[in-house]
A protein has these predicted regions:
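Active-site-flanking segments in enzyme catalytic domains
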Residues: 2-215
Length: 215
């Protein structure tokens, strides 16, 4: 493994050897962008690696801070991966305005939830029960649920979000955002990084909450 970047991101070169370099480079850069934005999450991203993921999964993030890129998808040419991802945005599966670079941005968004668990749960102690509580919060998307609830309230106070129900705010980001609150948070992060102030009102609100908590 090779340590790259000022935050100590480990790139598992052997596991990524069959993937297209530019696709991997873009993913690593996307993750570092998030780490730059959120100092409290810097020590929680431990590894970028490749693996054979189940059919249809482009990438994933684990509680242990590992982001895994699918060998099947990231071994494609840049244009090939672009076409695949653009097909998902055309269907509304992922936020409009995002591209293949935001695959890793989405996964880094999950690591931000892990940082919230560290801040609000694991910081209370290092005993077994505390560790179990942290893992349970990850499994149940407890912290992302709290972020989304607050962000929905904030979004409804804006002209763009006024009068919208929570479900409508979430669905406006993407259909994938409706899966669960962890995916809502990650999709909002990708939406904001891609579109900035022009992102959906919920995404703008989620970003503001995360910046307050972890920035």
């Amino acid at each position: 493994m090779k340590n790259v970047g000022q935050w100590g991101i480990y790139v598992n070169e052997r596991s990524l050897s069959g993937q297209t370099f530019e696709n991997v480079r873009e993913a690593a850069a996307a993750v570092e962008t998030i780490m730059n934005e959120f100092p409290q999450a810097q020590g929680l991203f431990h590894e970028l690696r490749g693996d054979d993921l189940r059919n249809g999964v482009i990438a994933n993030a684990s509680y242990s801070g590992v982001i895994t890129l699918s060998n099947s998808y990231f071994s494609r040419t840049e244009d090939g991966l672009n076409r695949t991802y653009d097909g998902t945005t055309a269907k509304g599966l992922h936020p409009a305005g995002t591209n293949k670079s935001h695959i890793a941005t989405h996964e880094a968004g999950h690591i931000l939830e892990r940082a919230l668990i560290d801040k609000h749960i694991l910081s209370k102690g290092n005993g077994l029960l505390t560790q179990l509580a942290g893992a349970d919060a990850w499994r149940k998307a407890t912290m992302s649920g709290k972020v989304i609830s607050e962000a929905c309230r904030l979004a409804k106070k804006t002209p763009a979000g006024k009068g919208m129900k929570n479900d409508a705010l979430i669905k406006s980001v993407s259909s994938y955002a409706t899966m669960n609150r962890a995916e809502t948070l990650a999709e909002c992060v990708a939406d904001y990084v891609a579109n900035g102030a022009n992102a959906k009102p919920l995404s703008v609100a989620v970003w503001s909450v995360l910046k307050r908590e972890l920035g």
